[in-house]
Amino acid sequence: MKKVLAFFAEGTEEIECLMVVDILRRAGVSVELIAVAPENLVKGSHQITVLCDKNISELSENDFSAADLLFLPGGIPGVPHLEENKKLLEALQKQFQAGKDLAAICAAPGILGRLGFLKGQNFTSYPGFEEGISGVEGAKWSGKAVEVGQQIITGRGMGVALDFALALVERLEGAEKAAQLKKGVQHPECIV
């Protein structure tokens, strides 16, 4: 069974995170929602309190390395809070160096860019958050809804959270599973 760690800090965009967690779990992926905060009850950017499965302080290096994909949702001030966490940044570095997948949506691709992971790659993000990253060492902001690279998948924002989540399902469980879920959740493209 594939494993994903999804990180949730104070001020995270709730829909971007929980849509991905929900869709991945529907696909049969083991997803742990990780609090990047003092407590496991974390308030998102729209004052919705989320009970996370574990706290980042509880995770060992083995917990991180067992994950097939690490996921960073967007939201302000959630993204700055994620980026302040040294343990998370170290885990992202190790995941990237191991050739494993990373995913980020909205403002969160900026974290990957500032870590140097977007060199020579197309990426997308919420408009404005590409500044200082696009053009640096060949990183190119495409502006697409979802950008799927060899190791990194990025999404533009909350409005594309379902399509972003389905792209992660396709990466982890294959195109057939993603198509089944797309139809099952009544994605607009499947309604005739």
Q: Which residue stretches match the model-derived regions?
A:
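N-terminal beta-loop-helix "entrance" segment that forms/cooperates
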Residues: 34-53
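Active-site-adjacent pocket-lining segments in enzyme domains
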Residues: 3-8, 12, 26-35, 54, ...
